[in-house]
């Protein structure tokens, strides 16, 4: 990409999209196009095609998505599949029709099988069944990355895909019914501290292993890949480090300063037992993460405190 290339970031108000915009601006890119949902509903094919025909972006970062944690995924299976599939197909297809030079599709590590080898290499995609708690979202994301691959094969496009691990950081969603584990913990321990509660109850038994990547590090990788990678196979984005949910809750409590008890509701689901990405491909390309987990949680908590309305989204 040239510094004045016309770059469209879809989903710029979300955590990932806003981080990509910050990273592009930090690196000196000056021609960044964004649209709010009110200005451009990506689930409307006619509106998306009109936008691409008029604006003709040269590069596209597709970071728009309908996202949520276990509760949201289980209660709105059809919505998660339909909304994500239609918006990504609309954007990718319109980009192809209007001669976009390169597109980068942002997915999720939930695309990999529930019992995938650990750490999970890119090659394990579609080798066995998915985790049921987020299967609808995963299937939509798999469809998006495969559509990019098939366009490359049939029409010679240069569309790439990136599969991040669990993300956190500025502009996250802290709503208890619609967010992921780390922002939920930040909100829960903050509210427990403020209320002086003696204990906090968390789901499951704390045994699942998880990996977390600070969103600004992901954004740095996204720009790096747009400039340095072409290929049909997706690229994993993570740290290559994991910890138990129990250790994570203790770390969040430490950062926030909550000193009460942590209890576990074992009647609630754990989710996938282990999720660690094989990040050797990104490393071979010359990229590695920068932000350690405790430092990132401190930055995320500062963002939460400075933007209390995010907890209501």
Model-derived regions, located:
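SDR active-site strand-loop-helix element
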Residues: 10, 35, 60-66, 103-109, ...
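Conserved sequence/active-site signature of Rossmann-fold short-chain dehydrogenase/reductase
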Residues: 43, 111-112, 167-169, 181, ...
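Active-site helix of classical SDR
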Residues: 136, 140-143
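Conserved beta-loop-beta element that borders a ligand/cofactor-binding pocket
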Residues: 107-108, 145-173, 183-185, 194-202
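NAD(P)H-binding glycine-rich loop region in Rossmannoid oxidoreductase-like domains
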Residues: 45-85, 94-97
